[in-house]
């Protein structure tokens, strides 16, 4: 990471890759600490795994009509955001390989433009992930506290409009990031957006879980109210809480890195933290890998659809689920 305060993931990964090839004692030019090198095969492997998993998630939601609900539409949006990280990492890794092995020779200025595109994809992905998580949180809030009016409030058309708005906003953020990639204000806005959105999500969940138990009891006492539906709503809220927790753990080090890069790039302790930048990128990719596992762990319907997609028709008996009486 250089001291010009720009992201430039491709340049950083090229330096890290060269370090892996030439030896472990490669230092960042602007940092007194050694950069932690991670083999490009790790990035590529995680990228491919995440890409396949999230394609499976989207395929399951499209295939199973029982998953055609606003929450799972927002989950699908989150899966697309995770796919964007995976695709960016895979393309970036291939580009690094081609450049390092002289299979691709391009001018440094063009490398910087390619780097800006990869950075923009990261920007779009994190904004889309945060907005999708917020949409899922609001959906769970409406499900729990306005259960009797949920289907009138959260319609398929309205959820589709929300998703379209999310991706229009994220695409705009990505374009701004490319146009003003040399400005520190872009990174500052991205950091501010992350922590503001995180604060909003955490506040919403604290409020939701403080009131949920009492409200569920009141709804269950009403004539015709379904306690099973309330339990399902709470399970959905717990699932999204798990997604939010994993998202925070995996993305927070990256944004802390950006914060330190702006505030104290030459400080020894800051440099030590920033020297592990490649590990923070690995954590981001791990988030994309873990999200589909959370869907499968928390949703029996999703697990069932996963198996139907993965298993061949000739092995239906071996792959069939035991039925519960």
UniProtKB/Swiss-Prot annotation:
Annotated Gene Ontology cellular component terms: cytoplasm; plasma membrane
Gene3D superfamilies: Rhodopsin 7-helix transmembrane proteins
Keyword Cell division listed: no
Topology in the lipid bilayer: Multi-pass membrane protein
Organs and tissues of expression: Expressed in the brain but not in the melanoma cells.
Record field: transmembrane: 38-61, 74-97, 115-138, 156-179, 187-211, 240-265, 274-297
Keywords: Cell membrane, G-protein coupled receptor, Glycoprotein, Lipoprotein, Membrane, Palmitate, Receptor, Transducer, Transmembrane, Transmembrane helix
Localization terms from the record: Cell membrane
Protein name: Melanocortin receptor 5
Source organism: Homo sapiens
